[in-house]
């Protein structure tokens, strides 16, 4: 009796997979839609740099990105990450805010001040969802913000937001500036 001699059969867990939900599920519209809509991936061989002091987070991001054809490099601190960027600039950076030594904000400032890396899109990562962190990350020049823990879907949704028409990650300001520079200037005669 102490170990549950009179067993009760536990209720069947409800499945939340898109196939199990079908079209009738209460939240199925969002769940099914995101999986049916084809994901827009960056080009094969896109280089991503992961800077995070958690080996678990680094391993998870590396696995997800490599499974989609990305080439990854990893650093457990900002200083090493900046060195890797100098050696071979990536197409995209995932940058944790809380790091030993230089924090993510300091690293982001260094990335934006360096002419050889200032064009690289940066997705900041943090275990905190405080609006102040997001505000400072955006103000310093982050292109997006991702809260830990994150899903595979969120990783690719953040990347997709940064892809240009050639499926290359670009800074939001770069694409806006590029399209403004390419737009024809229309002048009308002054009466």
Give residue spans per PLM region.
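Alpha4 helix (beta4-alpha4-beta5 surface) of REC/receiver domains from two-component response regulators
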Residues: 62, 106, 129-144, 157
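Short hydrophobic/Thr-rich beta-strand motif most characteristic of the beta2 strand and flanking loop
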Residues: 69-76, 84
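Acidic catalytic/metal-coordinating carboxylates
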Residues: 77-80, 103-109
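Active-site beta3 strand of CheY-like receiver
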Residues: 88-94, 99
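C-terminal output helix
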Residues: 150-160, 167
